[in-house]
Regions:
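A short core secondary-structure module
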Residues: 170, 174-222
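Flexible, glycine-rich active-site loops centered on histidine and acidic residues
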Residues: 117-123, 157, 198
Length: 411
């Protein structure tokens, strides 16, 4: 058997996921160069401290800054704003690779790119993009996106945070947000608030607006409870409190009262990343279980040569590959400017379900060893469980998909 250090996930020895699928367009040389450099960074800088950070909960700001220098923290932000301007398929592969090594860091990268920067790219004016995106793309500032509240999770339009317009066109923001990634370490915040009552004949999604501001430019903003989580423990998650925050008129992000359409687009983009994260953590567990069962002998032979174990590995491999194909399809549709709400709902739902399942199977294959912290598979499971909740729960994805199914067959 290998040592504890050697038993960790090893991205450098992982099967190459780039371009091996006959039904998926292969990655080009530039894309492979990006992933190769990232894998080297993950192996040398991220993997050695991942288990310790899981125990301490320490946020790895130094690693985030280095990823900023590599272009990873502004992966899909246009070059003119300081980003790398990568396609979505490459971004999804980046997220998968980081998840294989450190789920907490993966969530930081995914949310920073897809949510805060994603919303500014979708709804921002040119002036807002010029002001906020360069610092975000370089990770000089981290981005946080505030939608969820104590009383509004999946029912996101039920938010109570409000912003009142003042005679001079400025705004006063009051309320709170829960479970905000980068909540206490963020520098730039995009916050959803109700500015108007829903218009007659419109749903409660109407009348919601978005605002963007830098933390160091406002007063009345404080950090509440920092969450003690099951997994993803070195990813920062905190409550935000707004008490009469004065925001200038130019803080309004997008059209007044009509931000919810942008929110849906942001979440669609975010689901690519969360799906890839679920896939990556499942891949980490699968690869670890495959190595372990080839080394661990029971009944006179390696566990992997028992048909029950071999067939379970085959099933895990097939499901993870299917998840990757669904994610790639959604990514390609997004980049082509085609509707991808339904494909990404399928991808996010399936990839996170089978990713968590792979983690659970890995624990089972390791037996008692899978349940102790000396081995990483329990961490993979704890980290991955969030992917079935964040950016829209399993139930929300099934609702989105089922509505499309019924519409197709009713017509």
């Amino acid at each position: 058997m290998t040592s504890t250090a050697e038993r960790s996930a090893r991205p450098d020895t992982a099967p190459d996921a780039l371009g091996q699928n006959p039904n998926v367009q292969p990655f080009n040389e530039d894309q492979r160069t990006i992933i190769s450099a990232l894998r080297s960074f993950l192996k040398n800088k991220v993997e050695p401290g991942a288990a310790e950070r899981d125990q301490t909960g320490e946020f790895p700001m130094d690693l985030v800054r280095e990823l900023g220098e590599m272009g990873i923290m502004g992966a899909q932000t246009p070059e003119k704003y300081g980003g790398a301007e990568l396609d979505t398929a490459t971004f999804a592969q980046i997220i998968e690779e980081i998840a294989v090594v450190d789920g907490s860091l993966c969530l930081t990268v995914a949310s920073h790119n897809s949510l805060c920067q994603g919303h500014i790219l979708i709804g921002g004016t040119e002036e807002q993009k010029q002001k906020f995106l360069p610092d975000l793309a370089s990770a000089r500032k981290l981005g946080a996106w505030g939608l969820t509240e104590p009383g509004s999770g999946s029912d996101s339009a039920g938010l109570q945070t409000n912003a009142k317009e003042q005679p001079d066109g400025s705004w006063i923001l009051n309320g709170s947000k829960n479970f905000i990634t980068q909540g206490s370490v963020g520098g730039t915040y995009v916050i959803l608030a109700r500015t108007d009552p829903p218009r007659e004949g419109k749903g409660k999604n109407d009348g919601i607006s978005a605002f963007v501001f830098n933390r160091d430019e406002v007063q009345g903003f404080s950090i509440g409870r920092k969450e003690d989580k099951l997994g993803l423990r070195s990813s920062d998650t905190a409550q935000l409190i707004f008490e009469d925050i004065h925001l200038p008129a130019e803080a309004l992000l997008g059209e007044r009262g009509n931000a919810f359409k942008d929110v849906m687009r942001v979440l669609d983009g975010g689901r690519v990343g969360i799906g890839a994260m679920g896939l990556g953590l499942g891949r980490a567990a699968f690869e670890y279980a495959a190595r372990y069962t080839l080394e661990r002998e029971q009944f006179g032979k390696p566990l992997a040569y028992n048909q029950n174990i071999a067939f379970r590995l085959a099933e895990m491999d097939t499901k993870l590959e299917a998840a990757r194909l669904l994610i790639r399809k959604a990514a390609d549709l997004k980049d082509a400017g085609q509707p991808f709400t339904i494909p990404v709902a399928r991808a996010k739902y399936y990839a996170t379900v089978v990713g968590v399942e792979a983690c659970d199977e890995a624990i089972q294959m390791l037996g008692g060893y899978g349940y102790i912290k000396e081995y990483p598979v329990e961490r993979f499971w704890r980290d991955n469980r969030l992917t079935r909740i964040g950016e829209g729960t399993d139930e929300v994805q099934r609702l989105v998909i089922s509505r499309d199914v019924l519409k197709r067959f009713e017509d």
